Amino acid sequence: METNIIELSQSLKISQKQIEKVLELTAEGNTIPFIARYRKEMTGNLDEVEIKAILDLDKSLTNLRERKATVLAKIEEKGKLTEKLRAAIEAAEKLADVEELYLPYKEKRRTKATIAREAGLFPLARLILQNAATLQEEATALTNETFPTAEAALAGAVDILVEAISEDVQLRAWTYHEMLTNSSIVSTLKDQDLDEKQVFQIYYDFSEKIADMQGYRTLALNRGEKLGVLKVSFENNVDKIIRFFEVRFKVKNDYIHEAIQQAVKKKIIPAMERRIRAELTETAEDGAIQLFSDNLRNLLLIAPLKGRVVLGFDPAFRTGAKLAVVDATGKMLTTQVIYPVPPAKAAQIEASKQDLSDLIDQFGVEIIAIGNGTASRESEAFVAEVLKTHPNVSYVIVNESGASVYSASELARHEFPDLTVEKRSAISIARRLQDPLAELVKIDPKSIGVGQYQHDVSQKKLSESLDFVVDTVVNQVGVNINTASPSLLSHVAGLNKTISENIVKYREEEGMIRSRDAIKKVPRLGAKAFEQAAGFLRIPESDNVLDNTGVHPESYPAVEKLFQMLAITDLDQAAQEKLQSLDVKKVAADLDLGEATLKDIIADLLKPGRDMRDSFDAPVLRQDVLDIKDLQIGQKLEGVVRNVVDFGAFVDIGIHEDGLIHISKLSNSYVKHPSQVVSVGDLVTVWVDKLDIEREKVNLSLVAPRESN
């Protein structure tokens, strides 16, 4: 463990003391959100991402150390472990390097070289290396039933040399670094019929130095190859590699030359190509997962539209649009099916206008949330037409990715057992606008669709990363224990699926939970679960104002003492002024609290019941529909960032297809990655840069035309 702590500290640039505390707190059963929020003094104010990085790297280093121990033991069993080899294995920083060092000592399947050694041809292989003048005679003397001629014996000796050369650790390492530096990845078209939409067109004749490969290109090549569209290969300087080997072995005969040719071309280069492809893929996957995670976090933090009556509009052509009205709390008021777009007849469309208008009037609808799937553009035009007679009502295009997944789920069936899948979907679309976080947690994050190549990466790693993001955001925002669904509650630190369901059942049977202390009455919610969860659960109905803040119950006595010190009885303006003027260092010492903890407590007391999402951008409300034909080059528009990818960002500007801001158009200065400039959910001012009306493609710029280079 001590070795891990030193390496963790060096790799993460975090002090050993901080790392020791994180590992100690985790071993005691504390969760990442709890440690980050309520144990700041112990960890030196590390956040959730830093804590997770410590735990992930600790696990990785432990796996590496265990593999080293296994490899060392196996080599020692064979009696071939030297001090030099031991030192090399112990110094290896990657599993791949450990496996390279282990390769010559691994149990092998029966090979040509194995057969040649068993036939006693190893001395002949040594003579070839020594360039002995009597090779033919020596080979003849070693003939046998398996190798009946001198040439056959020499060929067997060459097989031994091929294996020995191909397993030479130093030569393999040199080749690996040579290829990393100078080789290129090449792709060519294999079958255009499998690429009808020409998605992979730029890769039909593609070449890129390995050192310059971008992650999204690696994943695109992998997908194109998997689909049979592309053939992917390497372009290597084979002659340079062979010359290096020949100098190393001081080649003086054709047999050594042949052994090197075979070892390089058939063994070492293919092995290094596999390793490099695997490493490129792993790096690309990690980048894609991180990007998806960042996008998901920003999506979950989009400001909720609280206290609004919303009509969810799930568009469709033939089967009709499904509508659902939900009240300000998200409770379903009614559902309906209308036929607002062709192939519906004109009379049906007119009747649908009246139906929608009646729903708006009857329930006081303030916003219409339109799903962005099939028939979305036509439905948007229909809604905009109806809203001409309802000037106080707006609409928003909502990303409906995953809504169909939710509506067919067991959870949706439990929530709305009497509704069709489509009507459940309309409710989900409406609720996504009211409270994106509460609704999106009901869906597998992978279905939300704010990544790139998410289906081409390790699904286990993706799930772990996205689950961490959801857990982090849910706990940072806090959860109303009296209104939250089991899905939302299950992401609260210390709670699991069973306890979350028990909380909902307890509410249904016993009524509203009116204090944090009452949470302890929930079945299966023990002392540890309470400790971890309590600070993240909000109770607006409680008589104790602290129960609706992020202040943990363990700090209540200190807060009561603080109130006595400041003569505070109510959190009015006078109390807030007193709290703002505190000498934090002195008061923290008086209360036996850490300064970081006291600062958090004061922040909560100044804004009890605050929602951190309120400081983020809210969705753009629209009343008029915009058509791509209305756009002009240089036109200024307002939009919302829908997705961030490696090559740019997609922005909803109110037309059917999102516009693309290429990375080169994000700034006048160099941008390494789009996420440095924009995030999902950001409200942005953009200018139309290029238009392709026929293909319905719009390129945008974040730089005003007069400012661009």
Residue ranges and their predicted role:
Residues 31-32, 43, 47-148, 476-615, ...:
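Accessory alpha-helical DNA-binding modules that contact the DNA backbone or grooves
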Residues 275-293, 447-480, 586-633:
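Long, charged amphipathic helices and adjacent flexible linkers at domain junctions
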Residues 97, 396, 402, 407-477, ...:
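Long, charge-rich intrinsically disordered scaffolds of nucleic-acid metabolism proteins
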Residues 50-53, 64-74, 78-312, 316-418, ...:
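Duplex nucleic acid-engaging cores and interfaces of nucleic-acid transaction enzymes
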Residues 138-150, 209, 228, 240, ...:
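Low-complexity, acidic/Ser/Thr- and charged residue-rich accessory regions of DNA metabolism proteins
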Residues 19, 338-343, 367, 408-421, ...:
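Short beta-alpha connecting loops at secondary-structure transitions
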Residues 177-185, 313-317, 373-378, 398-405, ...:
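A glycine-rich phosphate-binding loop feature that marks nucleotide/adenosyl-phosphate handling sites
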